[in-house]
């Protein structure tokens, strides 16, 4: 281990042999840091926190501090961070609230400076949370989603995989997979074509998704009727099936379209 002489690292913390801890950082008793990870200067990692392999934690990050929720009374809760995550300056991640509750972050994510992951959130893998992106409690971000800068996401919202949220948006309802959305409140603008192509979704599948989006967001039908029409008229490719199931299972409702979809 390479621990700067000004850092304070608990004897009870479990750090892999090659972990680096920078100046003036504080590592608490129940912290586990896996091989290849780096903790920058002036960081605080406290509580029940597990950090995976090859993570980069930059200056001023605070991981595992008490959840910002009035119902929390000191229960043992957890923060679990996977491998190859980049957590930039002054980000804050809180653990769960209930006894045994967890905030869970997957692998290969980028959290830009000042972003916040609140209690009981789940972030998948290959996501980007841009500067000052704010996830309230119990938010779920699926794989390969992009959250723009200064976005605020309401409690319990689900953000579907391969979706992208424009900067400064206010998100109060679920964001469907594969969508592009923006606004205050956020509204659907169409498919995230760039994201779909970058993830090697073929043209036929994209065409089926376009058809599904027109029915779901441009037909004027009630959601349950639009879902029935999609199931009846469109081939249930894996992408279409995932979209249908996501919308059918939404608890907060789905963000609606702001205009006619092409």
Regions found by a protein language model. Name each.
Residues 2-187:
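Structural signal for interior beta-strand "rungs" in well-ordered beta-sheet cores
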Residues 1-6, 11-12, 17-18, 54, ...:
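Terminal amphipathic alpha-helical/low-complexity segments used for targeting or macromolecular assembly
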């Amino acid at each position: 281990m390479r621990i700067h002489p000004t850092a304070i690292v608990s004897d009870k913390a479990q750090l892999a042999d090659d972990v680096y801890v920078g100046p003036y950082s504080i590592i608490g008793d129940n912290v586990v840091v896996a091989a290849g990870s780096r903790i920058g200067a002036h960081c605080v990692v406290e509580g029940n926190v597990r950090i995976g392999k090859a993570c980069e934690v930059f200056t001023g990050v605070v991981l595992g501090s008490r959840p910002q929720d009035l119902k929390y009374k000191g229960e043992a809760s957890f923060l679990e961070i996977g491998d190859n995550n980049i957590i930039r300056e002054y980000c804050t991640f809180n653990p769960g609230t209930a006894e045994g509750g967890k905030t869970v972050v997957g692998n290969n994510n980028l959290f830009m400076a000042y972003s916040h992951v609140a209690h009981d959130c789940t972030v998948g893998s290959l996501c980007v949370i841009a500067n000052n992106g704010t996830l309230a409690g119990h938010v779920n971000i699926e794989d390969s989603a992009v959250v723009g800068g200064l976005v605020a996401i309401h409690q319990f919202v689900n953000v579907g995989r391969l979706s992208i949220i424009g900067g400064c948006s206010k998100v109060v309802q679920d964001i469907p997979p594969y969508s592009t959305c923006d606004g205050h409140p956020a509204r659907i603008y169409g498919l995230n074509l760039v994201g779909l192509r970058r993830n090697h979704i073929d043209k036929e599948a994209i065409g089926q998704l376009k058809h599904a989006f027109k029915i779901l967001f441009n037909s004027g039908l009630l959601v349950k009727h639009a879902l029935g029409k999609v199931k009846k008229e469109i081939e249930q490719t894996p992408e279409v099936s995932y979209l249908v199931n996501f919308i059918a299972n939404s608890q907060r409702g789905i963000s609606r379209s702001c205009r006619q979809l092409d």
